[in-house]
């Protein structure tokens, strides 16, 4: 479970840590999950999130139930690894606290790579509470993707929106 408010930045959010804590409480107290990792604010670095995603799926067996919850900023960057796999040539990303728009990012390709290691018979539920979350698992081919979206359209700059790099902004 990841929650990042980006406190003290121009892109500060107000409820992501609260959402993550509520999810943690729900799944541990009501549903009895025991092996739960909670990454909040400064602990939600690129390396920590990636390490914990790999931990989540490692050793899972048929019948296991896995959950990944992310509440924070999402955005897009130019797809430099394989631009032809995305119609818009953009990768959706979740934005860790140490985001640098180049190497400290977590792309939809990375999420797909991790989640594609989940074996048949394992129930994986992913909550992405962020902008651009509807496309973050758009290449999923071995699992069912259900997208539920609710929100408001925000301008490219200002407010609590995390503006993507200029090369991506030019395409929006």
Which functions belong to the PLM regions below?
Residues 37-46:
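Short beta->alpha junction loops
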Residues 133, 169-171:
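Intrinsic-disorder/coil detector with helix-boundary
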Residues 1, 38, 126-128:
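Structural beta-sheet core signal
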Residues 7-21, 25:
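Glycine- and acidic-residue-enriched helix-capping/strand-helix junction motifs
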Residues 22-35:
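Signal peptide-proximal N-terminal region
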Residues 46-71, 75-142, 154-159, 163-164:
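Caspase-like (clan CD) cysteine peptidase catalytic core
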């Amino acid at each position: 479970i990841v929650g990042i408010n980006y406190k003290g930045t121009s892109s500060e959010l107000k409820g992501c840590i609260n959402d993550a804590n509520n999810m943690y409480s729900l799944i541990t107290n009501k549903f009895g999950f025991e092996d739960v990792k909670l990454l909040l604010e400064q602990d939600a670095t690129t390396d920590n999130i990636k390490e914990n995603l790999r931990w989540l799926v490692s050793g899972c067996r048929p019948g296991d139930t896995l959950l990944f919850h992310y509440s924070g900023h999402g955005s897009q960057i130019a797809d430099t690894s394989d631009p032809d796999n995305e119609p818009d040539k953009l990768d959706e990303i979740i934005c860790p606290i140490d985001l640098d728009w180049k190497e400290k990012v977590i792309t939809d390709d990375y999420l797909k790579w991790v989640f594609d290691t989940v074996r048949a018979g394992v129930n994986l539920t992913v909550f992405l509470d962020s902008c651009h979350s509807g496309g973050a698992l758009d290449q999923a081919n071995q699992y069912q993707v259900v997208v539920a979206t609710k929100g408001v359209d925000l301008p490219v700059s200002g407010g609590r929106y995390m503006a993507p790099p200029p090369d991506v902004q030019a395409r929006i």
